[in-house]
Every structure is written in structure tokens, then in C-alpha cells.
Curated annotation (Swiss-Prot):
Protein's UniProt name: Organic hydroperoxide resistance protein-like 2
InterPro entries reported for this sequence: KH_dom-like_a/b (IPR015946), OHR (IPR019953), OsmC/Ohr_fam (IPR003718), OsmC/Ohrsf (IPR036102)
Single Gene Ontology BP annotation: response to oxidative stress
Gene3D superfamilies, A to Z: 2.20.25.10, 3.30.300.20
Pfam families in UniProt: OsmC (PF02566)
Chain segments annotated as coiled-coil in the UniProt record: none
UniProt family annotation: Belongs to the OsmC/Ohr family.
């Protein structure tokens, strides 16, 4: 493996009703099974929320980089990610899917779609996921 630019290690104990924390103690999160999946409705986070948070931040940063490299660095995109757990017919379990909603300003719809496509090709999360999960991207301009 090439020498990493950055690395982090997160440890999980207790599965979906447990906790996750970083080895350097800068991150800690209690977890709970969502009510929709048989949980007790506790307001703790879950793996899908953490995935959506990471993906939305990473994609937004990739898009900001693409915009800045094209002298549009003053535009502040908004990216939301909805994570889905879907039935997996292959093994009877579940699989992950994601929908990205990207909003840009001060450009045409066609320009926005071009920038979002470039960001999708640049974003580390997208690179890791686009061949393994279903990803839908919606682009809008305000």
C-alpha cells in the first residue's frame, strides 16, 4: 500500500447497540438500533447516520475543491446524503444504498450537473462505493 496521507482508527464494541470511538479519543458515539429495525427508539446514532455524515462531508469537500479549481470557490454547495438499508435478495440480509441531493447556486443546471459529476469522480467515498452500492444523485440549482 502507498503511504497514507492520513489515517484514523475507530473501534466498535457492542454492535448496533454499542459504541464507536477513535483510538486517539477525539471521537465517541453511542449507538442504538433504529426503532424501524426493532430498536427501542433511543435517540443515539446508528451506522447509517455515521455513513451518511461522512459521505456528505466528503462529497461536499470534493465539490468545493472542483468549484475552487474552476474559480467558483465562493459558491457554497449543500450536500445531503440519505442512507438506505435495502433487502438483499442474494443472501437474505440487507445492503446499503445512498441518495445524494446536491444544491448549487449561481450557475445553470447543466453546469451544476457537470461539477457534481466531476466531484463524484474525485470524492474518495464515491470512488470506493460506486461499483459496490446503488448511488443516486439529484442535482438542483437555487
Amino acid at each position: 500500500m502507498v503511504k497514507p496521507l492520513y489515517e484514523t482508527k475507530v473501534i466498535s464494541n457492542g454492535g448496533r447497540d454499542g459504541k464507536v470511538f477513535s483510538e486517539d479519543n477525539t471521537f465517541y458515539q453511542d449507538l442504538a438500533v433504529p426503532k424501524e429495525m426493532g430498536g427501542n427508539g433511543v435517540t443515539e446514532s446508528n451506522p447509517e447516520q455515521l455513513f451518511a455524515a461522512g459521505y456528505s462531508a466528503c462529497f461536499n469537500n470534493a465539490l468545493m475543491h472542483i468549484l475552487k479549481s474552476d474559480s467558483k470557490g465562493t459558491i457554497e454547495p449543500e450536500v445531503s446524503v440519505t442512507a438506505y438499508l435495502l433487502p438483499d435478495k442474494n443472501d437474505g440480509g440487507v445492503k446499503l444504498a445512498a441518495e445524494l441531493d446536491v444544491t448549487l447556486t449561481d450557475m445553470t443546471q447543466e453546469e451544476a450537473e457537470t461539477y457534481v459529476e466531476k466531484a463524484h469522480n474525485y470524492c474518495p467515498y464515491s470512488k470506493a462505493l460506486k461499483e459496490s452500492i446503488d448511488i443516486e444523485i439529484q442535482v438542483s440549482v437555487n
